Protein backbone atom coordinates (compact mmCIF):
# COMPACT_ATOMS: atom_id res chain seq x y z
CA UNK A 1 0.00 0.00 0.00
CA UNK A 2 1.33 3.36 -0.92
CA UNK A 3 1.15 6.08 1.67
CA UNK A 4 -1.11 8.86 0.48
CA UNK A 5 -0.07 12.47 0.85
CA UNK A 6 -2.91 13.14 3.30
CA UNK A 7 -1.66 10.37 5.63
CA UNK A 8 1.94 11.57 5.89
CA UNK A 9 0.99 14.21 8.45
CA UNK A 10 -0.84 11.71 10.64
CA UNK A 11 2.05 9.24 10.46
CA UNK A 12 4.63 11.92 11.26
CA UNK A 13 2.57 13.25 14.16
CA UNK A 14 1.99 9.78 15.58
CA UNK A 15 5.69 8.95 15.39
CA UNK A 16 6.63 12.25 17.04
CA UNK A 17 3.98 12.16 19.76
CA UNK A 18 4.19 8.46 20.52
CA UNK A 19 7.64 7.23 19.43
CA UNK A 20 7.75 4.18 21.72
CA UNK A 21 4.27 3.09 20.71
CA UNK A 22 4.96 3.62 17.00
CA UNK A 23 8.17 1.57 17.19
CA UNK A 24 6.49 -1.15 19.24
CA UNK A 25 3.66 -1.28 16.68
CA UNK A 26 6.18 -1.91 13.92
CA UNK A 27 7.86 -4.61 16.00
CA UNK A 28 4.53 -6.35 16.54
CA UNK A 29 3.85 -6.18 12.80
CA UNK A 30 7.21 -7.83 12.14
CA UNK A 31 6.35 -10.57 14.67
CA UNK A 32 2.98 -11.04 12.97
CA UNK A 33 4.59 -11.40 9.57
CA UNK A 34 7.21 -13.85 10.82
CA UNK A 35 4.56 -16.02 12.48
CA UNK A 36 2.39 -15.83 9.34
CA UNK A 37 5.30 -17.02 7.17
CA UNK A 38 6.22 -19.86 9.54
CA UNK A 39 2.64 -21.10 9.69
CA UNK A 40 2.22 -20.69 5.94
CA UNK A 41 5.15 -23.05 5.42
CA UNK A 42 3.43 -25.60 7.67
CA UNK A 43 -0.12 -25.27 6.31
CA UNK A 44 0.16 -23.96 2.75
CA UNK A 45 -2.65 -21.99 1.10
CA UNK A 46 -5.20 -24.81 0.92
CA UNK A 47 -6.14 -24.56 4.60
CA UNK A 48 -7.89 -21.28 3.78
CA UNK A 49 -8.84 -21.88 0.15
CA UNK A 50 -9.74 -25.55 0.70
CA UNK A 51 -8.45 -26.27 -2.79
CA UNK A 52 -11.09 -24.02 -4.30
CA UNK A 53 -10.92 -21.12 -6.72
CA UNK A 54 -11.41 -18.06 -4.52
CA UNK A 55 -12.32 -15.93 -7.54
CA UNK A 56 -15.74 -17.61 -7.30
CA UNK A 57 -17.99 -15.73 -4.88
CA UNK A 58 -19.37 -18.83 -3.12
CA UNK A 59 -15.88 -20.24 -2.55
CA UNK A 60 -14.69 -16.92 -1.15
CA UNK A 61 -17.69 -16.86 1.19
CA UNK A 62 -16.88 -20.40 2.36
CA UNK A 63 -13.31 -19.31 3.03
CA UNK A 64 -14.57 -16.33 5.05
CA UNK A 65 -16.77 -18.63 7.09
CA UNK A 66 -13.75 -20.80 7.89
CA UNK A 67 -11.80 -17.74 8.93
CA UNK A 68 -14.69 -16.61 11.10
CA UNK A 69 -14.64 -19.95 12.94
CA UNK A 70 -10.88 -19.72 13.49
CA UNK A 71 -11.20 -16.15 14.74
CA UNK A 72 -14.08 -17.11 17.01
CA UNK A 73 -11.93 -19.89 18.50
CA UNK A 74 -9.18 -17.37 19.25
CA UNK A 75 -11.64 -14.89 20.76
CA UNK A 76 -13.11 -17.64 22.95
CA UNK A 77 -9.62 -18.62 24.11
CA UNK A 78 -8.69 -15.01 24.87
CA UNK A 79 -11.97 -14.51 26.72
CA UNK A 80 -11.45 -17.66 28.78
CA UNK A 81 -7.91 -16.68 29.74
CA UNK A 82 -8.74 -13.08 30.60
CA UNK A 83 -12.15 -13.37 32.24
CA UNK A 84 -11.44 -16.54 34.18
CA UNK A 85 -7.82 -15.78 35.07
CA UNK A 86 -6.75 -19.04 33.49
CA UNK A 87 -3.12 -20.06 33.18
CA UNK A 88 -1.70 -20.39 29.68
CA UNK A 89 -0.69 -23.94 28.83
CA UNK A 90 -0.33 -24.36 25.09
CA UNK A 91 0.30 -20.93 23.63
CA UNK A 92 0.67 -17.49 25.13
CA UNK A 93 -2.12 -14.95 25.25
CA UNK A 94 0.02 -12.76 23.04
CA UNK A 95 0.23 -15.55 20.44
CA UNK A 96 -3.57 -15.67 20.39
CA UNK A 97 -3.76 -11.92 19.78
CA UNK A 98 -1.26 -12.23 16.93
CA UNK A 99 -3.17 -15.16 15.42
CA UNK A 100 -6.39 -13.15 15.57
CA UNK A 101 -4.76 -10.19 13.84
CA UNK A 102 -3.25 -12.47 11.20
CA UNK A 103 -6.62 -14.07 10.47
CA UNK A 104 -7.99 -10.57 9.87
CA UNK A 105 -5.22 -9.85 7.40
CA UNK A 106 -5.74 -13.22 5.72
CA UNK A 107 -9.43 -12.31 5.28
CA UNK A 108 -8.34 -9.09 3.57
CA UNK A 109 -6.01 -11.07 1.28
CA UNK A 110 -8.91 -13.37 0.38
CA UNK A 111 -11.08 -10.30 -0.31
CA UNK A 112 -8.42 -8.79 -2.53
CA UNK A 113 -7.91 -12.05 -4.44
CA UNK A 114 -4.28 -12.28 -3.28
CA UNK A 115 -4.48 -15.43 -1.16
CA UNK A 116 -2.11 -18.15 -2.35
CA UNK A 117 -0.69 -16.03 -5.17
Predicted regions and their residues:
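Intrinsically disordered, low-complexity regulatory regions
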Residues: 1-117
